[in-house]
Amino acid sequence: MELTVLYLYAAAVAVLLCSSVDFIQSPSDVFGPVALTEPTPSASRDFGAVVSEAPVAVMRPGSAADVARLLGALSSSSAGPPAPGRRPRAAAVAARGAGHSLHGQAQARGGIVVETRALPRAVEVVRGGGAYADVGGGALWVEVLEACLREGLAPRSWTDYLYLTVGGTLSNGGISGQAFKHGPQISNVLQLEVVTGTGEVVTCSPTQSPELFFAVLGGLGQFGIITRARIPLQVAPPKVRWVRAFYDSFETFTRDQELLVSMPELVDYVEGFMVLNEQSLRSSSVAFPAEVNFAPDFFRSDDDGGGGGSSKKVYYCIEFAVHDFQRQDDSAADHVVELVSGKLSYLRPHAYSVEVAYFDFLNRVRMEEESLRSRGLWDVPHPWLNVFVPSHGAAGFKDLLMGTVTRGDFEGPVLVYPLLTDRWDGNSSAVVPAAPEGVVYIFSVLRSTDPARCGGACVEGILEEHRRLADEACRRLGAKQYLARQPSRAHWRDHFGPSWDRFVARKARFDPMHVLGPGQGIFPRADSSLM
């Protein structure tokens, strides 16, 4: 049975809601003309493909007002937050964008999933000295990029993969190789429209309702659903000069990365990755159009002083990019690349440079996606691990990681690159490690598991291995996980550390009924089910 904008299903929900507080209202009084449909398979799936929790309904809102009616009705169905040991009386709601969560964070077992892609996705670009774009929370970043490029403009900070929603990345952080220079995406927002857990539609900014503004940025969907964002823009370069340079020493690799991020006046993008095997070298070169004549000897003894003690050699690759505006001097970007490359201590002559269109550079992971799809390795479980590590602990984490990786059959990239902590706004809800040096590294272990070789038990084993690795890194190195679903409230308390009390207070203020974000598992619900 398919239910569209019908009151039948709303009636069932309303009866359950209203009976919990001993009064009766008509469905239209409770919800108004809200579209609730039966759940589709996608509502209980995500990119991680390791968690599947089915809702009882899906909402495809046409506006922020639709979301507000739903959340307002749910939050008002009980007089206050659940007392210890008491059954909560409001259904849980999760916002789902492009479905790229890793651990069921956008799912709502027995509750309602709000499909934010249904929100208006128009991108309004405003030119001038303070150019910006007003975009819907359900718009994909690639849609934002395409609209802005038509005006010769673009946002400053990106994620590596562009087929993610604006509201989704702003609820987490949003990082890529530009973050050292401009900060994460959550540091590049002028204004938001948010529907709070109580159903209030609020326009907020650093000066207007700032507590809500900073709460939802990196807030893991706990305080509100982002329905619109205002993003600052810069002039977009036509081309990018893209460079890769190879290393056989982790110490030299990271030292050169930190040198690069100290030159924001010259360099526009810095990332890097580990070269574990032939497959990782081939897959990482899918989107890089230059011919790379690098033939690493993986069977050399690894004696780079990193302390790993591995019998097989690990190599590393730095990526950096320079914007090419092609104005008076067509060779200006080439001169910058030559200047910067001359300061690096890579394995000569293994540095490779290519010029690509700006859009193609930002959309580079799409090519890798197409390659993985062609091999049946895209719609598979992705037991990923993302960890922020203070720079003084980077070598230690690399050694911990290499103690858990079976390199011969490892499928997927391992990204490693530095971020500067002063580019993160401490008012936001996002968590990065304390780093006296001002530098943290993101380690992203991005596995794709072939179901023919790694079934359910194998995937569970990888997840457990990652859990142990993350726990040890947090305990020994002061690391913090990114995009993770912590296994317990105690783990979440440890994760937030000194900012835990602020996070809890924000929840009490903006979502006192604990309606939002059940998939994160931060604020447990005795029973979030409608049925």
Q: What does each of the following model-derived ranges do?
A:
Residues 1-531:
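Noncatalytic alpha-helical scaffold of FAD-dependent oxidoreductases
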